[in-house]
C-alpha cells in the first residue's frame, strides 16, 4: 500500500470523526449484513487484514474466538485499536498485507473490511489467505463495489441546481489505479471488476459461499439525510468463501 494515508495527522483526524470511527460496527451501514456472513467464531483463530480501529477483532473476542490477530500498516490506526479495543486475546501487528507473513494452515477465519480496493494485486492476497487458512476455513471480506470504483472520482453527477442526477460508471473493464477524493484528500485505489474478485477466489481454490450487495438498514434510511440515495447504486460488495479440502 506504500505510504499509509491514515498516518497523515490531518487525514486521520477527519477519519476519526466518521460514524464508523465513533460508533464502531454499529456505525457501519453494511454491518447488519456483514456479521451474518461470519461463521461461528467460538474457539476459532481469527485473522483481520487491515484491522483499523480493531472493531472486528474485539467482536471476534466477544464471540468467544480463541485468539485474534489484527494486521494494519497504519501506526495511528493500531494505536487507536490498542486504546479502545485491546484484549489479552488480541495481537496487533504493524505490517502491510502485502508484506505480512501468515503461518501456513493456521487460521480458522480470515476477515477484512474495506481494504482490498487499496491493494493492486488481489491474486497474491488470495493465495496468501488460502495458504494461511486451515481446511474448511472461512474468508469473509468487504470491498467497495466495482460500480463504485470504476469511474474513479467517486462523486455523484449533479445538475446546475445541485440536485443529484446519476452515478457515473465509466472504464469499468479497464482495471487498475484510480485517484479519488476521500475526506478532502487524494487517495489511490485499484479498481477491479466483479469477475476479477470472483474468479480470483475460484482460481486460488476457494468455494464461494455468498455474494451480497448490501443496502443500508431501514433506520439509517429513515434517520440520515441523503441516505436514500444509497439505494440508487451499490457502494459495497460482501463476499464469503471457504477453503476446500
Question: Residue ranges of each PLM-predicted region?
Answer:
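Conserved class I S-adenosyl-L-methionine
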Residues: 1-41, 55-59, 80, 139-175
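Class I SAM-dependent methyltransferase SAM/SAH-binding core
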Residues: 47-49, 53-99
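A short acidic, Gly/Pro-enriched loop at the edge of an enzyme's catalytic core
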Residues: 98-110
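A short SAM/SAH-binding and catalytic strip from SAM-dependent methyltransferases
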Residues: 108-122
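A short glycine-rich, Lys/Arg-flanked "PGG" loop and its adjoining helix->strand segment in the class I
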Residues: 123-138
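Short alpha-helix
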Residues: 176-177, 188-211
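C-terminal lobe and adjacent flexible extensions of AdoMet/dcAdoMet transferase-like proteins
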Residues: 200-245
Amino acid at each position: 500500500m506504500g505510504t499509509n494515508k491514515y498516518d497523515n495527522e490531518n487525514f486521520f483526524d477527519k477519519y476519526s470523526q466518521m460514524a464508523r470511527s465513533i460508533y464502531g460496527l454499529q456505525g457501519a451501514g453494511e454491518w447488519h449484513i456483514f456479521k451474518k456472513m461470519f461463521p461461528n467464531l467460538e474457539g476459532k483463530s481469527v485473522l483481520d487484514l487491515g484491522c483499523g480501529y480493531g472493531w472486528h477483532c474485539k467482536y471476534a473476542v466477544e464471540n468467544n474466538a480463541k485468539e485474534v490477530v489484527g494486521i494494519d500498516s497504519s501506526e495511528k490506526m493500531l494505536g487507536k485499536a490498542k486504546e479502545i479495543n485491546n484484549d489479552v486475546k488480541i495481537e496487533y501487528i504493524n505490517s502491510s498485507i502485502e508484506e505480512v507473513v501468515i503461518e501456513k494452515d493456521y487460521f480458522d477465519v480470515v476477515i477484512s473490511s474495506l481494504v482490498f480496493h487499496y491493494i493492486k494485486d488481489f491474486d497474491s492476497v488470495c493465495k496468501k489467505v488460502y495458504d494461511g487458512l486451515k481446511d474448511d476455513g472461512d474468508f469473509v471480506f468487504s470491498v467497495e463495489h466495482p460500480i463504485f470504483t470504476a469511474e474513479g472520482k467517486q462523486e455523484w453527477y449533479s445538475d446546475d441546481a445541485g440536485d443529484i442526477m446519476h452515478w457515473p460508471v465509466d472504464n469499468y473493464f479497464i482495471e487498475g489505479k484510480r485517484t479519488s477524493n476521500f475526506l478532502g484528500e487524494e487517495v489511490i485505489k485499484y479498481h477491479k471488476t466483479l469477475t476479477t474478485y470472483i474468479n480470483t477466489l475460484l482460481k486460488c481454490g476457494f468455494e464461494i459461499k455468498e455474494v451480497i450487495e448490501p443496502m443500508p438498514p431501514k433506520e439509517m434510511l429513515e434517520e440520515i439525510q441523503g441516505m436514500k440515495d444509497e439505494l440508487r447504486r451499490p457502494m459495497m460488495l460482501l463476499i464469503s468463501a471457504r477453503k476446500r479440502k
